[in-house]
């Protein structure tokens, strides 16, 4: 199973401070993991420090995907997660 440590993060463009990663799994579901803050220093994602993450469940392919709001995992994005909690959710997504 894929874990947080296997995610590859990239910086946001357009003056957003933070990073993002996306991974699509073999079952057609995936995960988006982000953390960002505004230029004035306030966190804009569902995080409150640099050790928390926000995730969304994805459905699709690497080229074309959408946020999926209809899984048993969540019907929204989930914030304030540790790396370990992100890994736990990644494993659940891979088992869908």
What is each model feature region?
Residues 1-96:
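Catalytic phosphate/metal-binding cores of nucleic-acid and nucleotide-processing enzymes, i.e., regions
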